[in-house]
């Protein structure tokens, strides 16, 4: 609202009239789909309203009111800014200033979000010459009313003095690249900006601005006539532009304000407004997002073609063909792979995949030319069943997979151009498919390519420092391309409504058969697809200190090659889900499982007694290096059971022994903290007389101080002391764990000395993603195979205070926690607790405990 006096009754009446007319247009839009009609109608309604205000202010006919930006195009979204220019003659009466200010104020009073400027023609030209943003805004100037002669004079001078087509092209392309960089150069954002993201409306507007500035036309039809795009491409551009405009308009209507970001909260409503309905396999929002990603992908592809074509017109090449790459098929032209003529793919369908093999293997080629991209785009009918079954194409595809470098770039380009989905039809089904599982932050196709990229990085010397152990393993792994095939198929069956691992096996088996992959390699690929989740589930959800767990896992993998392949795929898979999911702790769990299993496969028996003896001997050797007296450990070790020594490695046993050997019968809590040996975490040791609420009390402290528990290993000594170890991370900010270790020791020891009752759990706020896509909380309590403990499995949306809420319920029922494995997967948790409690065999107590836990973890 403007800063002038309160609106008059007449202004309020006019505002109500305008609001009612706009509401009528929006209501009609809700039941129709023609967004262009809506945008034009909103522009006309705004024109009429502004004219009435202009007349009321008595502004002279020597001025002109000009619409600029989107309003200038006549494309006003429901809650867009209304950008106007009051154009003044060079010589004007300064007394007009007050009336112009009144006009702008009254326009605000209508309820319009006005963006205004007041300039002479000379000022417009001067500012446009210096600022490409002003230049762009004025490019689409449209006279609403006022002096026609003044507006025409402005238009002529603007095009003659302010607009340089080449400079404008360079500036807008740079601006587009910078904008894309803000969105990580991908249209596949979880919450895309329909206007600004790569493949969004701004890309389409940028192309039309560049074309208009160059005099090539201001519509897709005109660009088609000019020969810059084909009729088919123009049709595709109009279709996708219409969808994006409609989506943006519906977001505005649903939100009741300007809303260009397709946030989680609005995705379901937006989907339903387009008529999408949930199915058994897909949410309505997932269907809408897939449609959006396909549109953004097509816009990105066509924009690349158009920009290269316009650039070729504005900057004629000074040099032509650099070299011939494939006789009568491809040449290199200015670093781009170009077909020799537009009929290459029609004459030689096998050249389609050859293009990507050449891109992958030819040094100096940095991409595909506009001519090649266009030919690919228009070759969809060629990429049919006959093309997919062609022996040469299958051979070329395997060559692309088996090159020593360039594989990731080649497959990304194949996906961007839709060739990958045309060759592997089941891959096409998952392109743009969102996964609202609170775990993956990429669409299925992008996740698959990310996993492929991660495996490739293991094999590239320049990246060996990132994951040295993985790089070492893949360096000795024969035919690593089998891992790339497994990566392509491990999630290819997502969204089909069944077990994607089982369905993916059939796809992988068929691929191997059709591409001549031998028996052993084919068997490994199919097995990897079937078991790609197995290793992470064992490492993160089972007690790997239990020899039986290791024995069962070793039986599944069978040999070292299978174990190594599964380990490499698992690390790449977890790292390819979300930047938040992977951490060094999970890395250690997987590496430990790999090494233990490898020893078993090599003939070592998973024998608890021999493992216990080995770890104790190693720990004693470390203690001697620390100058701990020879028999000093006995007082503590005599109180510890076998489980303690199997759950901790030798270095950890030595550290805990060194801390506690003088305090075996301590009267007060002993708390020690140190940076975790695996990094990126804090290890906290607690030694104190045991009590039922101890675990919950420790969790309450961590919760209140922003520390997130990754792992808990709980032991009880023979003389009634708790010896608990926690791995925690700081949840809110980057922190040096060495700096906070002393503070944690002091605060937690003080907290444990208090006798106050457990505080009420604080139900921390869920993330927007979790609020929009809540998962059904699950609690499962059952006896373990030996009947010694009970296993509690909890699955829920992650939130601050969740672990403490669980621990408090257990404490209230005097149920002891023997061990806890905290598994955070993005926005959800899947926690496993090993419980001991005398009353847990009572079915009524089990039901009561499960009921209270469900209530505690509910959203």
From Swiss-Prot:
Every HD domain range: 444-566
GO MF entry, a single one: phosphoric diester hydrolase activity
InterPro entries: ACT-like_dom_sf (IPR045865), ACT_dom (IPR002912), HD/PDEase_dom (IPR003607), HD_domain (IPR006674), NT_sf (IPR043519), PII_UdlTrfase/GS_AdlTrfase (IPR013546), Polymerase_NTP_transf_dom (IPR002934), UTase/UR (IPR010043)
EC number from the UniProt entry: 2.7.7.59, 3.1.4.-
Highest taxon listed in the record's lineage: Bacteria
Transmembrane segments annotated in the record for this chain: none
Pfam family of the protein (one): GlnD_UR_UTase
Activity control mechanisms: Uridylyltransferase (UTase) activity is inhibited by glutamine, while glutamine activates uridylyl-removing (UR) activity.
Known catalytic reactions: [protein-PII]-L-tyrosine + UTP = [protein-PII]-uridylyl-L-tyrosine + diphosphate; [protein-PII]-uridylyl-L-tyrosine + H2O = [protein-PII]-L-tyrosine + UMP + H(+)
Cofactor(s) the protein requires to work: Mg(2+)
UniProt keyword terms in alphabetical order: Hydrolase, Magnesium, Multifunctional enzyme, Nitrogen fixation, Nucleotidyltransferase, Repeat, Transferase
GO process terms (BP): nitrogen fixation; regulation of nitrogen utilization
CDD domains according to UniProt: ACT_ACR-UUR-like_2 (cd04899), ACT_UUR-like_1 (cd04900), HDc (cd00077), NT_GlnE_GlnD_like (cd05401)
Ranges for region Uridylyl-removing: 326-682
Zinc-finger recorded as keyword: no
Keyword Nucleotidyltransferase: yes
Annotated stretches, region: Uridylyltransferase: 1-325
Domain ACT: 683-762, 791-859
Protein role: Modifies, by uridylylation and deuridylylation, the PII regulatory proteins (GlnB and homologs), in response to the nitrogen status of the cell that GlnD senses through the glutamine level. Under low glutamine levels, catalyzes the conversion of the PII proteins and UTP to PII-UMP and PPi, while under higher glutamine levels, GlnD hydrolyzes PII-UMP to PII and UMP (deuridylylation). Thus, controls uridylylation state and activity of the PII proteins, and plays an important role in the regulation of nitrogen fixation and metabolism.
Similarity comment text for this entry: Belongs to the GlnD family.
Domain statement: Has four distinct domains: an N-terminal nucleotidyltransferase (NT) domain responsible for UTase activity, a central HD domain that encodes UR activity, and two C-terminal ACT domains that seem to have a role in glutamine sensing.
UniProt-recorded name of the protein: Bifunctional uridylyltransferase/uridylyl-removing enzyme
Species: Burkholderia vietnamiensis (strain G4 / LMG 22486) (Burkholderia cepacia (strain R1808))
Species classification: Bacteria, Pseudomonadati, Pseudomonadota, Betaproteobacteria, Burkholderiales
Gene expressing this chain: glnD
């Amino acid at each position: 609202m403007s800063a002038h006096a309160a609106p008059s009754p007449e202004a309020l009446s006019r505002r109500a009239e305008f609001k009612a007319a706009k509401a009528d247009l929006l209501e009609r839009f809700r039941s129709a789909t023609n967004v262009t009609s809506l945008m034009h109608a909103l522009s006309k309604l705004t024109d009429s309203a502004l004219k009435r205000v202009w007349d009321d202010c008595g502004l002279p006919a020597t001025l002109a009111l000009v619409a600029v930006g989107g309003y200038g195009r006549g494309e006003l979204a429901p809650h867009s800014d209304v950008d106007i220019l009051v154009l003044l003659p060079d010589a004007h009466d300064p007394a007009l200033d007050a009336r112009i200010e009144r006009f702008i104020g009254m326009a605000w009073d209508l309820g319009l979000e006005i963006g205004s400027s007041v300039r002479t023609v000379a000022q417009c030209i001067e500012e446009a010459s210096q600022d490409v943003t002003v230049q762009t805004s004025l490019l689409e100037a449209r006279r609403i009313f006022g002096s026609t002669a003044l507006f025409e004079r402005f238009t002529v001078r603007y095009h003659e003095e302010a607009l340089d087509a080449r400079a404008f092209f360079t500036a807008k392309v740079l601006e587009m690249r910078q904008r894309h960089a803000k969105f990580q150069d991908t249209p596949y954002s979880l919450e895309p900006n329909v206007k600004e993201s790569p493949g969004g409306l701004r890309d389409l507007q940028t192309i039309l601005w560049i074309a208009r500035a160059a005099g090539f036309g201001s519509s897709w039809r005109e660009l088609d006539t000019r020969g810059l795009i084909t009729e088919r491409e123009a049709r595709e551009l109009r279709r996708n532009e219409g969808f994006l405009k409609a989506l943006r308009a519906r977001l505005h209507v649903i939100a009741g304000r300007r809303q260009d970001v397709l946030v989680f909260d609005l995705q379901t409503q937006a989907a339903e407004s387009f008529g999408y309905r949930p199915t058994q396999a897909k949410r309505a929002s997932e269907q809408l997002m897939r449609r959006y990603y396909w549109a953004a992908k097509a816009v990105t592809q066509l924009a690349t073609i158009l920009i290269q074509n316009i650039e070729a017109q504005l900057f004629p090449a000074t040099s032509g063909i650099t070299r011939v790459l494939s006789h009568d098929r491809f040449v290199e032209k200015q670093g781009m792979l170009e077909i020799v003529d537009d009929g290459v793919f029609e004459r030689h369908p096998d050249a389609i995949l050859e293009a990507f093999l050449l891109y992958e293997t030819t040094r100096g080629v940095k991409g595909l030319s506009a001519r090649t991209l266009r030919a690919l785009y228009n070759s969809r009918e060629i990429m049919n069943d006959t093309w997919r079954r062609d022996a040469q194409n299958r051979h070329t595809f395997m060559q692309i997979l088996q090159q020593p470098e360039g594989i990731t770039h080649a497959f990304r380009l194949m996906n961007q151009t839709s060739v990958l989905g045309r060759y592997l039809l089941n891959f096409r089904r998952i392109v743009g498919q969102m996964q609202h599982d609170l775990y993956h932050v990429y669409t299925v196709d992008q996740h698959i390519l990310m996993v492929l990229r991660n495996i490739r990085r293991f094999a590239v010397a320049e990246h060996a420092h990132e994951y040295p152990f993985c790089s070492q393993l893949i360096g000795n792994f024969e035919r690593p391309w089998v891992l790339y095939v497994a990566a392509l198929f491990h999630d290819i069956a997502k969204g089909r409504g069944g077990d994607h691992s089982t369905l993916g096996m059939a796809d992988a088996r068929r691929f191997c058969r059709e591409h001549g992959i031998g028996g052993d390699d084919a068997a490994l690929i199919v097995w990897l697809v079937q078991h790609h989740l197995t290793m992470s589930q064992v490492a993160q959800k089972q007690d790997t200190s239990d020899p039986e767990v290791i024995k069962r896992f070793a039986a599944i993998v069978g040999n070292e090659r299978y174990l190594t392949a599964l380990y490499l795929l698992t690390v790449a898979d977890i790292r390819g889900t979300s930047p938040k999911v992977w951490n060094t702790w999970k890395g250690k769990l997987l590496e430990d499982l790999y090494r233990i299993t490898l020893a078993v496969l090599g003939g070592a028996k998973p024998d608890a007694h021999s493992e216990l003896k080995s770890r104790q001997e190693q720990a004693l050797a470390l203690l001697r290096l620390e100058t701990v007296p020879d028999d000093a450990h006995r007082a503590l070790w005599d109180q510890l059971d076998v489980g303690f020594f199997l759950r901790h490695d030798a270095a950890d046993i030595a550290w805990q022994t060194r801390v506690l050997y003088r305090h075996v019968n301590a009267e007060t809590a002993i708390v020690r903290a140190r940076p975790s040996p695996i990094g990126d975490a804090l290890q906290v040791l607690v030694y104190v007389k045991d009590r039922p609420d101890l675990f919950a009390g420790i969790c309450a402290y961590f919760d209140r101080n922003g520390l997130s528990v990754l792992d808990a290993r709980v032991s009880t000594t023979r003389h009634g002391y708790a010896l608990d170890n926690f791995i925690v991370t700081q949840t809110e900010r980057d922190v040096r764990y060495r700096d906070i270790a002393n503070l944690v020791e002091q605060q937690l020891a003080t907290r444990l000395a208090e006798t106050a009752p457990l505080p009420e759990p604080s139900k921390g706020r869920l993330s927007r993603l979790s609020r929009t896509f809540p998962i059904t909380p699950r609690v499962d309590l059952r006896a373990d195979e030996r009947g010694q403990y009970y296993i509690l499995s909890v699955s829920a949306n992650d939130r601050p205070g969740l672990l403490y809420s669980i621990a408090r319920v257990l404490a209230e029922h005097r149920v002891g926690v023997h061990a806890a494995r905290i598994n955070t997967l993005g926005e959800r948790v899947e926690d496993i607790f090993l419980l001991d409690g005398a009353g847990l065999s009572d079915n009524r107590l089990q039901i009561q405990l499960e009921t209270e836990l469900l209530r505690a973890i509910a959203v």
